[in-house]
Amino acid sequence: MFGGKSHILRGSVSLALIVLILLVIILLVSEENPLRDSLFEVKRQFSSSSSSSSSVCNFAKGKWVEDRKRPLYSGFECKQWLSSMWSCRIMGRPDFSFEGYRWQPEGCNMPQFDRFTFLTRMQNKTIAFIGDSLGRQQFQSLMCMASGGEDSPEVQNVGWEYGLVKAKGALRPDGWAYRFPTTNTTILYYWSASLSDLVPMNNTDPPSLTAMHLDRPPAFMRNYLHRFDVLVLNTGHHWNRGKIEGNHWVMHVNGTQVEGEYLKDIRNAKDFTIHSVAKWLDAQLPLHPRLKAFFRTISPRHFKNGDWNTGGNCNNTVPLSRGSEITGDDGSIDATVESAVNGTRIKILDITALSELRDEAHISGSKLKPRKPKKASNVTSTPTINDCLHWCLPGIPDTWNELFIAQI
């Protein structure tokens, strides 16, 4: 008797379960069912999130867009870190429309910079910039960004820890190092325009000639690499005959002066040096597992109608007159840096193409005065020197740092 009732009960439960399943299916396939829409939305968000996390953002492709929150700091107030020659507001530039744009990468979002978040992320870390004056601009930009462009007496000058002190008779030290004590974050810059090791050839007369060892990274980098958590390298604009001869640099490889014609070609010497320093650094990275290394591509020049010393200028003041977008294979990527870091653990910080669009953001004629001729009687007029190499700050190097921070 009890077995029969049990069988009937199980049959009723099974029938009810089947009916319930059918109702759920009908609800899910109904186009007007809100539950269906919610489930599909969850699935879409999950898929989108998975896709974003699995793909690598190419920050070099994208477009410049207007942003009323710019600039990130004041060119008037960041005097503690910013050289006056690069502060176009201090130097009297009358137009500042170039400040009101940010870079929007294609297909991904670049986090909005927040100095407190940045310093917290960089707690107990050291960020080092090693390169030429454009590297120094990026360093000063990051100091202004991290301090909010405000005087920060609590920030400590720790240059002495890295041997960055002004030598007797020098105009300035070879670099600077500052520490934010609240997070123990150190940001430093070392001047090495060629990223090669420079050694006086005559110790009794150091200014005479300097051996430029193309196959050796700067001694500063070799000596302090173990203290860095993040490293950004750059070189480029000192690789010309005038700079090398003017600095009395004599190129060396394997400890001996270069004799072959191949490396006497400045372009080949530059290519050789960049590949050499990248190869050396990549070999060091396994020994310093916490170190993240970047090689920044070259910053473009925008001289027209001549060069810096022949009346060249970049007097355009209209933002984005060259266009606003970099897509596909557009751009002028630094092929030498790209080749050097290919297959290494070093990341490329590609800023060339996006900076190429911003010719109006250079210092131009805001800074430099006309050159004084040696003999006025021999010169009827002296052209104004325009700076179409360096950038106004605040300005384009702030964007370089945003791309850099997004990739740390």
Curated annotation (Swiss-Prot):
Motif annotated as DCXHWCLPGXXDXWN motif, chain positions: 387-401
GO MF: transferase activity
Compartments, record wording: Membrane
A GO term from the CC aspect: membrane
Motif GDS motif in this chain: 131-133
InterPro entries assigned to the protein according to its UniProt record, in alphabetical order: TBL_C, TBL_N
Keywords of this entry: Membrane, Signal-anchor, Transmembrane, Transmembrane helix
Coiled-coil positions: none
Family: Belongs to the PC-esterase family. TBL subfamily.
Role description: May act as a bridging protein that binds pectin and other cell wall polysaccharides. Probably involved in maintaining esterification of pectins. May be involved in the specific O-acetylation of cell wall polymers.
Extra remark beyond the main annotation: Contains 2 motifs that are conserved in esterases, but it is unlikely that this protein belongs to the catalytically active pectin esterases.
Protein name per its UniProtKB record: Protein trichome birefringence-like 14
